């Protein structure tokens, strides 16, 4: 009886490695379930990319009437932070932690930066579009700060997450692990694009703020 159960388990494992996508990316120290949980940060990164470059890019120019030069500058700010990935990776490589977690503090910090930038963004949009008694540059400056915080959080979380995945993967499975992580990034971008399109089909100013707050 035990032999038949063992044979059934072996056949089931072989079926998984044969038919499940990226099942061969798993290893003894990094199971497929653990790898999928680790790759969740790529979904949020893909969502933030679509929200910044796909949704707010058009909405701020067409619907909110903001100058295209301001919007293009805001979108360029996260890209200008890309060279900081080298410093982030170096710091996470040499980070000393009493718990032995080198990457987790950076991954957590990047996620919190994304949350802070997206949570602050609705207030920045209100300052840009609604009349207020403050200086005129207050709204664009607040929007740039939220874009900067979100973009920096994306770079920090993605750099630390990819480094953590490559640390846990074996040398043989490392290429497939990285491929799975970038597949999750594409899934996050495609899924969030469809969701944002459905939610903003009947566009409204309040609806836009609700969508951004939900994304945060």
Show which residues each predicted segment covers.
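Membrane-embedded alpha-helical bundles of multi-pass transporters/translocases
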Residues: 2-216
């Amino acid at each position: 009886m035990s032999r038949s159960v063992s044979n059934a388990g072996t056949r089931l494992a072989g079926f998984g490695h044969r038919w499940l996508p990226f099942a061969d990316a798993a290893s003894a120290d990094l199971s497929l379930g653990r790898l999928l949980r680790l790759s969740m940060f790529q979904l949020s990164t893909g969502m933030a990319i679509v929200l910044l470059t796909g949704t707010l890019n058009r909405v701020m120019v067409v619907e909110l009437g903001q100058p295209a030069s301001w919007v293009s500058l805001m979108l360029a700010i996260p890209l200008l932070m890309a060279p900081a990935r080298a410093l982030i990776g170096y710091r996470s490589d040499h980070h000393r932690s009493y718990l032995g977690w080198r990457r987790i503090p950076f991954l957590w910090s990047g996620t919190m930066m994304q949350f802070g930038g997206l949570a602050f963004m609705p207030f920045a949009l209100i300052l840009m579009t609604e009349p207020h008694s403050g200086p005129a540059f207050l709204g664009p400056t607040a929007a740039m700060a939220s874009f900067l915080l979100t973009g920096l959080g994306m770079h920090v979380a993605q750099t630390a997450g990819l480094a953590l995945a490559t640390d846990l993967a074996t040398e043989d499975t490392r290429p497939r692990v990285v491929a799975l992580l970038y597949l999750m990034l594409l899934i996050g971008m495609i899924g969030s694009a469809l969701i944002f399109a459905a939610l903003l089909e009947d566009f409204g100013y309040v609806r836009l703020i609700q969508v951004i707050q939900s994304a945060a």
